[in-house]
UniProtKB/Swiss-Prot annotation:
This is Acetylglutamate kinase. The lineage of its organism: Bacteria, Pseudomonadati, Pseudomonadota, Betaproteobacteria, Burkholderiales. It comes from Bordetella pertussis (strain Tohama I / ATCC BAA-589 / NCTC 13251). InterPro entries: AceGlu_kinase-like_sf, AcgluKinase_fam, ArgB, Asp/Glu/Uridylate_kinase, Glu/AcGlu_kinase, NAGK-C. Its main location: cytoplasm. The record marks K38, K257 as: Transition state stabilizer. One of its GO terms (cellular component) is cytoplasm. Substrate binds at G73, G74, R95, N197. Keywords: Amino-acid biosynthesis, Arginine biosynthesis, ATP-binding, Cytoplasm, Kinase, Nucleotide-binding, Transferase.
Length: 300
């Protein structure tokens, strides 16, 4: 089966010039600003979308923005677990993580997945550097305490899943100042050195807050947030989100994504979007054009 051509490759010179002209005011507006991108879903597994993502990130850096990538890797973790005869289990969108699973998470995310992303960005002209929470004490964490959403009196033990207690941004800012693109694996570490698996959406949201990011973009395998009828919701307020949580419209893996997005919006991130990672060049479309490709989250 042949690869689907990149849409950008078949544009006429006139159309490309028009696109660049449209991007100019956005480049001016966001020059020097930090953009945090949660990279996950199909965009991580389909070759043409991988290329599109890498080119977008490098272009954003070259025109003066400061992209920071926080990546997931759920399918890769599931594959690795299957190879050792384990089945992944989730509770309220969080992966149950015993000690053996945590070992797999560390070498899959901090090794295989992270290095693949770093290499991919570097191959198209960027300078990416991989980080985990241990590097520069970037992500400090403690064991996550959860309760049954249907019965808050019942605690849930989901193993070595972490809550972020502190983000130390110095190492990220130093890399940005030297024109590197940080690629962050969502692994935190406790005071005693215990490694914790942290949901990548949560890490991306907290990183955007601490870095004072202009934008947070969460890449997904859907057009954005959908209502019960499958219709795209182009914008969500805090009140609407509460209603969608209550009636079950937002559930599973979308729960931490929306919660983290709303927290980021409430804590100073100017623009938060859930974007369709299946759309080639979705980052450029969302950041540098008038055409949005997802759902905007507002704290109001």
């Amino acid at each position: 089966m042949t690869d689907t051509p990149d849409p950008a490759a078949v544009l006429s010179p006139a159309v490309k010039a028009a696109v660049l002209s449209e991007a100019l005011p956005y480049i001016r507006r966001f020059h020097g600003k930090t953009i945090v991108v949660k990279y996950g879903g199909n965009a991580m597994t389909e070759e043409r979308l991988q290329r599109s993502f890498a080119h977008d990130v490098v272009l954003l850096k070259l025109v003066g923005l400061n992209p920071v990538v926080v990546h997931g890797g759920g399918p890769q973790i599931d594959d690795a677990l299957r190879r050792i005869g384990k089945q992944g289990t989730f509770v309220q969108g969080m992966r149950v993580t015993d000690a053996e699973t945590m070992e797999v998470v560390e070498w899959v995310l901090g090794g295989q997945v992270q290095q693949d992303i770093v290499m991919m960005i570097n191959e198209v002209g960027g300078k990416a550097v991989g980080l985990t929470g241990k590097d520069g004490m970037l992500i400090q964490a403690t064991k996550k305490l959860m309760v049954n959403k249907d019965d808050p009196s019942q605690p849930l033990d989901i193993g070595l899943v972490g809550d972020i207690t502190r983000v130390e941004p110095a190492v990220v800012k130093a890399l940005q100042d030297d024109q590197f693109i940080p690629v962050i694996s969502p692994i935190g570490y406790g005071e005693d050195g215990t490694a914790y698996n942290i949901n990548a959406d949560v890490v991306a949201g907290k990183m955007a807050e601490v870095l004072g990011a202009e934008k947070l973009l969460m890449m997904t395998n859907t057009p954005g947030v959908l209502d019960k009828g499958g219709k795209l919701l182009r914008s969500l307020s805090a009140q609407t989100i509460d209603e969608l949580f209550a009636d079950g419209t937002i559930s599973g893996g979308m729960l931490p994504k929306i919660s983290s997005s709303l927290d980021a919006a409430k804590n100073g991130v100017n623009s938060v979007h859930i974007v369709d990672g299946r759309v080639p060049h979705c980052l450029l479309l969302e950041i540098l054009t008038d055409q949005g490709v997802g759902t905007m989250i507002s704290s109001h």
